[in-house]
Structure formats: structure tokens, C-alpha cells
């Protein structure tokens, strides 16, 4: 990531709460933030030194720490934190994508860390319901001047971090939002075939068919295809049809017609032969990504694309050009797919902590501007230097990749908005191949996708959806998997299993497992919380600078 200077259907809950949905849990801390520029302080400068606390703090392990740097819990940056922070911290490694299992093991063995850093809202809600968390109001007031300033500047953080008992249990960060998932199309292929960027569903099918049948790469082989229904490609079709719960007449409702339209279009793409016939085996979309970057796929739905996306494509397709495109407008409206969550709760304190004061002091130190800048940018004149505006600018990219690239979760709770406003505007590093061209593509993407007139298709960001009660969560999970199976069956079965048959079976399944209870619960939640809930419309108040 570059440095910044100038920066309802029946499938309703399938999309919002399906296992495997990538949300910010997978998102990497952004190059953004700390409006609360309060230095870490120690009470009573003239008084005797306070006794140094000792705590445990969880830290995601993504398996990306270079051997030369040590381990994720013992490296130059964890040592720096212990040398400069107010407490002795024992970092506890938690596998990023198996965090719940690891935390459960730690709780069961009585080894839960004092400070728990966890992106997943549902798991933090579970810990709250099990009374495993400490309320933080008094601790923040007494020991966290930096976070107190954050709450004054962004009072919505307190509201989001407060649980039903009226007490604040979670600390979080502000990350100016930008597009997370966007659709990219091979414009050199469009030019060769004299086709425009598709604006309607029929045009999308026409372009996908041409990319599949008319040899757009000119190699004389039938080895390209137009679209992938794998992973995010499937969600993009749902988004195109607004296929989720939505607000109508100030109520949260679903619409079977939206689901049927989405399923029908997926089936149409498959029947026309314009998608990978084996897309169901591409569970995480890696094959689709590989096919796009190797020049075999014409339209790709990308998650957090960056300059490497373009550089990799150009490595095997030197003349390739790409552009962002919106999914076409349908009778249900026009929507985008995913945005980064601008208000992200990240951190809680274990109710069994032996030194909650030390835990809070350490957390406040970790989110201080001086701290996050050190962790994010590294050492001055080694990893960065100030530019002409006095903003930190990366140097030695290869060294940074080795010595800094693995440490992003150390500042996952920090609002990394520079107190010097001009330093939050992105600057292009011209030393990086394709950086200038990618910057233009990125700005085009943001112009298309960061528009409240073409909103996210979901009610809100996944992390701001309420957590279902355990019984309804099981019902919803069962519905998610079984409904997906039925939809996949009709998509690939030709005339032997029609969309109408699938819709009838989905209706029966919904009644059988009691999914209506889940939808009713969400509708009631919306009715009770619509005035205070953080919804899609609110995201556009927190857009990143361009």
C-alpha cells in the first residue's frame, strides 16, 4: 500500500451473514488516520514512577513474518512496544483465520489475554453475552486520554461500542472508507471487438459471450471466457439485483422477485457458456483471479485490488488495459458490492484481567499517533523520510516489505488519520511500476463506486449487523448453506431443474427450517434501532480523501 499525502429476498441473510463472507475481518489496516493527536501520558510527571504493569495481548498471526525478523510475537516491533510502552506485554499469537478456535481454547484453559483484538463482531458479541468482558467507560476516562479525545471527536464510536446494558465494552477506530470490491473489465478486448462497457444485463451477457467466443486475445484458440460466478462474482450478481433485505416504506423487507431475477441471470450466464463450468470448485475465487491475471478472463470482481493487480496482468499481457465498471442497472435499481467499514470495533478487555488499568494504559499507548506512525512507517531515514510538505514518505520499498510489512495488526486499533491534514491525501510513488496508471484507474473506480446515488446493496456493512441469538444463528447458517446448494443446483442443471422448481424448493426449505423467524428478528431490530443504527447511507460521510 502506498504512503498517503493528498488521500429481500429469501437470500437476504445469505449475503449478510454467510460463513466465509469477507468483511473487514480480512481487511488490512488502511493508510489513513489519528485525529486524536494526544501523546501518551503518565500521571504526575513529578511524582514517583508508577509500578509497571504486566499484561497479555492477542495478536493476529497471518503467517507472513520473515524468518529474519523473528516471530509475530517476538520481533523488532514487539520489542519496541515493550521498550516504549507503559506495560510489559506478552503477545499471544492467534491464527488470523482460526481466531475463534484459538480464543476458545485460551478461555477454556484459563489463559485468555487481558486485551483481545478481534475484528469479528459476532465473536465479540458472544463474549459479551457470556459476561467475559469488562465495561470500559471508567477505565477509558481514567487511563486513556488518547481514546477519550477520539470519543470527543467521533462520538459515534462510543455509540457503536456500547452494548444493550448501556455500557461501553468495545474500542475501535475510524478508517475513512473507500471501495473494497469492484468489477474490472479488459478494455483492450472491448476495443478489438468494437464493444462498449456494458450498461444493461443484456449487454453484460453480450460482452461476456463475445469474450468467450470471438478470440479477444487473438491467439487463435478458444481459451478465454467472459465472467466467473465463483465467490465474489456470484455476490456481484446478487448485488446487481439488490438481492438482500432492503428498506421499503420505512420497514425492513424481502422480495422474492429479486432473488428469482438474480438466480435466473446466473443460470442464463451458465447456460450461455460464458462462465467457467467448474466455478463451484473455486471456493475462494483464486482460480478466477489467476485466470484474469493470466489473460483468460475478461470481467473480474476484485477484492482490494492494488497496483500489483495491474503489474501482474501486464507481466504476461503487455498490451492489456483495464477499467472499472459498475454492475448494470436492473429493474430493482443499481448498486455496488462492498465498501470498507469506516467505523470498526477492534478491541475488548477480558473480565478476568488482573490489571485492567495496565491493559487500558497500554491500549491507549498503542493508538497514540506517535506509536502508530512508528509501527506503520518504521524508522526515519531508514524506512521513510519527510517530503517537502513534512509528510512521511516511504523509502527503501524492499526493506520496508521485509521489516515492516508483517506488523499491520499491531496498530489495528489505531485511527491512522494524520493530525496534519495534507498528509492524508494520497501521493503516487512513481518509482513503483505502473503506479501512475493504477492511480488513475483507482480514482476512476472510486468515482464510480463511492457514490450514494449508487449505494451498497446491503442494509449496512456486515460488521454493523446485529448478532442473531444462538438459536436463530443456527437456523440462518442452515438456510445459508442449503439455499446456496439449491441455487447452485439450478444454475448448473440446464432444463432438468428449473428456476421455478428451485424457487418452490427454497420456499419449502424456508418454512421447514424456520427462516422466517430470522427475517422477523431483523425486521424488529431495524424498527427498534433505525434511528441510531449505522446504516449504508452513513458510510458516505466517512469517505477517504482523494
State what each model feature region is:
Residues 137, 163-232, 246-286, 290-291, ...:
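Helix-loop-helix "hinge/cap" segment bordering the ligand-binding cleft or interdomain interface
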Residues 60-62, 232-243, 270-423:
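Extracytoplasmic/periplasmic substrate-binding proteins
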Residues 370-492:
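Conserved small-residue motifs centered on glycine
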Residues 75-91, 105, 189-190, 255-279, ...:
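Extracytoplasmic/periplasmic ligand-capture domains
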Residues 122-153, 160, 207-211, 222-248, ...:
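Carboxylate/His-rich catalytic cores and anion/metal-binding grooves
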Residues 6-10, 14, 26-183, 187-203, ...:
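Conserved N-terminal structural module of periplasmic/extracytoplasmic solute-binding proteins
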Residues 1-5:
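N-terminal secretory signal peptides that target proteins for export/translocation
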Amino acid at each position: 500500500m502506498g504512503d498517503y499525502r493528498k488521500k429481500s429476498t429469501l437470500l437476504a441473510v445469505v449475503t449478510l451473514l454467510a460463513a466465509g463472507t469477507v468483511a473487514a475481518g480480512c481487511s488490512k489496516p488502511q493508510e489513513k488516520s489519528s485525529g486524536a493527536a494526544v501523546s501518551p501520558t503518565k500521571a504526575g510527571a513529578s511524582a514517583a514512577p508508577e509500578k509497571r504493569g504486566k499484561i497479555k495481548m492477542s495478536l493476529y498471526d497471518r503467517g507472513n513474518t520473515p524468518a529474519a525478523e523473528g516471530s509475530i510475537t517476538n520481533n523488532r516491533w514487539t520489542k519496541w512496544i515493550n521498550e516504549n510502552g507503559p506495560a510489559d506485554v506478552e503477545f499471544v499469537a492467534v491464527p488470523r483465520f482460526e481466531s475463534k478456535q484459538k480464543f476458545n481454547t485460551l478461555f477454556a484453559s484459563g489463559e485468555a489475554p487481558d486485551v483481545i483484538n478481534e475484528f469479528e463482531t459476532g465473536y465479540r458479541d458472544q463474549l459479551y453475552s457470556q459476561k467475559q468482558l469488562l465495561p470500559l467507560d471508567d477505565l477509558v476516562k481514567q487511563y486513556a486520554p488518547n481514546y477519550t479525545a477520539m470519543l470527543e471527536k467521533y462520538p459515534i464510536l462510543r455509540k457503536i461500542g456500547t452494548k444493550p446494558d448501556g455500557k461501553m465494552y468495545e474500542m475501535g477506530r475510524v478508517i475513512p472508507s473507500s471501495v473494497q470490491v469492484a468489477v474490472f473489465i479488459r478494455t483492450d478486448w472491448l476495443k478489438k471487438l468494437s464493444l462498449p462497457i456494458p450498461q444493461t444485463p443484456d449487454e453484460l451477457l453480450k460482452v461476456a459471450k463475445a469474450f468467450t467466443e470471438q478470440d479477444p486475445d487473438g491467439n487463435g484458440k478458444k481459451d478465454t471466457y467472459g465472467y466467473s460466478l465463483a465467490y465474489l462474482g456470484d455476490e456481484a450478481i446478487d448485488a446487481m439485483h439488490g438481492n438482500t433485505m432492503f428498506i421499503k416504506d420505512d420497514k425492513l423487507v424481502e422480495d422474492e422477485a429479486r432473488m428469482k431475477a438474480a438466480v435466473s441471470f446466473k443460470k442464463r450466464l451458465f447456460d450461455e457458456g460464458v462462465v467457467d463450468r467448474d466455478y463451484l470448485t473455486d471456493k475462494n475465487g483464486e482460480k478466477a483471479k489467476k485466470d484474469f491475471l493470466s489473460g483468460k478472463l475478461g470481467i473480474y470482481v476484485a477484492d482490494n485490488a492494488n497496483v500489483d493487480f495491474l503489474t501482474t496482468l501486464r507481466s504476461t499481457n503487455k498490451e492489456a488495459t483495464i477499467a472499472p465498471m459498475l454492475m448494470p442497472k436492473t429493474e430493482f435499481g443499481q448498486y455496488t458490492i462492498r465498501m470498507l467499514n469506516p467505523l470498526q470495533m477492534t478491541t475488548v478487555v477480558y473480565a478476568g484481567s488482573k490489571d485492567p488499568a495496565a491493559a487500558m494504559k497500554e491500549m491507549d499507548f498503542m493508538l497514540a499517533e506517535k506509536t502508530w506512525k512508528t509501527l506503520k512507517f518504521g524508522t526515519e531515514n531508514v524506512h521513510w523520510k519527510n517530503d517537502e510538505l513534512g509528510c512521511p514518505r516511504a523509502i527503501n520499498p524492499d526493506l520496508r516489505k521485509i521489516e515492516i510489512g508483517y506488523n499491520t495488526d499491531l496498530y489495528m486499533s489505531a485511527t491512522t488519520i494524520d493530525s496534519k491534514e495534507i498528509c492524508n491525501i494520497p501521493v503516487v510513488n512513481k518509482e513503483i511500476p505502473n503506479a501512475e496508471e493504477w492511480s488513475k484507474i483507482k480514482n476512476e473506480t472510486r468515482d464510480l463506486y463511492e457514490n450514494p446515488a449508487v449505494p451498497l446493496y446491503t442494509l449496512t456493512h456486515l460488521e454493523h449487523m446485529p448478532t442473531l441469538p444462538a438459536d436463530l444463528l443456527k437456523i440462518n447458517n442452515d438456510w445459508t448453506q442449503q439455499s446456496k446448494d439449491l441455487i447452485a443446483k439450478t444454475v448448473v442443471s440446464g432444463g432438468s431443474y428449473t428456476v421455478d422448481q428451485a424457487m418452490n424448493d427454497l420456499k419449502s426449505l424456508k418454512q421447514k427450517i424456520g427462516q422466517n423467524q430470522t427475517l422477523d428478528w431483523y425486521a424488529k431490530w431495524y424498527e427498534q434501532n433505525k434511528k441510531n443504527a449505522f446504516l449504508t447511507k452513513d458510510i458516505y460521510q466517512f469517505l477517504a480523501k482523494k
